[in-house]
């Protein structure tokens, strides 16, 4: 009986040891996606916004050429990875059923080193993401909504 419990405990501990890195890796890729592409409530959406957020998010050493920020709530973005707010799109991607308010920051000027100067384009777009385990981990593109 005691030996059976020991084996069961060993299997349980080994199972715990194998599971967290996978979950942690999924969460770190999702967290990285949020850092690069999510800003719930932007303060302005012009070149000053782009220069400020790109610097705060660590995307300016060297200056990133282009980056899109999705505005709204995380639940709606996560729902793209499900049928609630997403449809299959090309190979292993999902496209949002609804459009999102987005700001695209594009590097303006010749130098790839700070101070980085950006131009902002704001609008409503459907977004295309790659998902892993039900979480968005890569923003592939954003598509302007047709009127």
From Swiss-Prot:
Cross-referenced InterPro entries, in alphabetical order? Answer: RNaseA (IPR001427), RNaseA-like_dom_sf (IPR036816), RNaseA_AS (IPR023411), RNaseA_domain (IPR023412)
Q: Which residues bind tRNA?
A: 45-46, 105, 127
Pfam families according to UniProt = RnaseA (PF00074)
Which residues are named in the active-site annotation?
37 (proton acceptor), 138 (proton donor)
Q: In which domain of life is the source organism classified? A: Eukaryota
Residues of the signal peptide: 1-24
Q: What class of enzyme is it?
A: hydrolase
What PROSITE patterns does the record tag this protein with? RNASE_PANCREATIC (PS00127)
Report the principal subcellular site: secreted
Q: Does the keyword Cell membrane apply?
A: no
Which positions form S-S bridges? 50-105, 63-116, 81-131
Q: Which UniProt keywords apply?
A: Angiogenesis, Cytoplasm, Developmental protein, Differentiation, Disulfide bond, DNA-binding, Endonuclease, Hydrolase, Nuclease, Nucleus, Protein synthesis inhibitor, Pyrrolidone carboxylic acid, Secreted, Signal, Stress response
Molecular function per GO? actin binding; copper ion binding; DNA binding; endonuclease activity; heparin binding; peptide binding; protein homodimerization activity; receptor ligand activity
Q: Which residues carry this modification: Pyrrolidone carboxylic acid?
A: 25
Q: Which GO terms describe its cellular component?
A: actin cytoskeleton; angiogenin-PRI complex; basement membrane; chromosome; cytoplasm; cytoplasmic stress granule; endocytic vesicle; extracellular space
Where does it live in the cell?
Secreted; Nucleus; Nucleus, Nucleolus; Cytoplasm, Stress granule
According to the record, the protein's activity is controlled as follows: Has weak tRNA ribonuclease activity by itself due to partial autoinhibition by its C-terminus, which folds into a short alpha-helix that partially occludes the substrate-binding site. In absence of stress, the ribonuclease activity is inhibited by RNH1 in the cytoplasm. In response to stress, dissociates from RNH1 in the cytoplasm and associates with cytoplasmic ribosomes with vacant A-sites: ribosomes directly activate the tRNA ribonuclease activity of ANG by refolding the C-terminal alpha-helix. In response to stress, the angiogenic activity of ANG is inhibited by RNH1 in the nucleus.
GO biological process per UniProt: actin filament polymerization; angiogenesis; antibacterial humoral response; antimicrobial humoral immune response mediated by antimicrobial peptide; cell migration; defense response to Gram-positive bacterium; hematopoietic stem cell proliferation; innate immune response
Q: Where is this motif: Nucleolar localization signal?
A: 55-59
Q: What is the E.C. number?
A: 3.1.27.-
Described function: Secreted ribonuclease that can either promote or restrict cell proliferation of target cells, depending on the context. Endocytosed in target cells via its receptor PLXNB2 and translocates to the cytoplasm or nucleus. Under stress conditions, localizes to the cytoplasm and promotes the assembly of stress granules (SGs): specifically cleaves a subset of tRNAs within anticodon loops to produce tRNA-derived stress-induced fragments (tiRNAs), resulting in translation repression and inhibition of cell proliferation. tiRNas also prevent formation of apoptosome, thereby promoting cell survival.
Give the multimer and partner information: Homodimer. Interacts with RNH1; inhibiting ANG ribonuclease activity. Interacts with PCNA.
- Describe the family membership recorded for this protein in Swiss-Prot or TrEMBL: Belongs to the pancreatic ribonuclease family.
What's the protein called, per UniProt?
Angiogenin
Gene name per UniProt: ANG
């Amino acid at each position: 009986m005691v030996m059976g419990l020991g084996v069961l405990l060993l299997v349980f501990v080994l199972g715990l040891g194998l599971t967290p890195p996978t979950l942690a890796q999924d969460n770190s890729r999702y967290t990285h996606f949020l850092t690069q592409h999510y800003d719930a409530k932007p303060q302005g959406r012009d070149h000053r916004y782009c220069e400020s957020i790109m610097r705060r998010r660590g995307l300016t050493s060297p200056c990133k050429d282009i980056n899109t920020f999705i505005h709204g709530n995380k639940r709606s973005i996560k729902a793209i990875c499900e049928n609630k707010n997403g449809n299959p799109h090309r190979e292993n991607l999902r496209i949002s059923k609804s459009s999102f308010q987005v700001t695209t920051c594009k590097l303006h000027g010749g130098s790839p080193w700070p101070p980085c100067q950006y131009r902002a384009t704001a609008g409503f777009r459907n977004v295309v993401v790659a998902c892993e385990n039900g979480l968005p981990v890569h923003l592939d593109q954003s598509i302007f909504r047709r009127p």
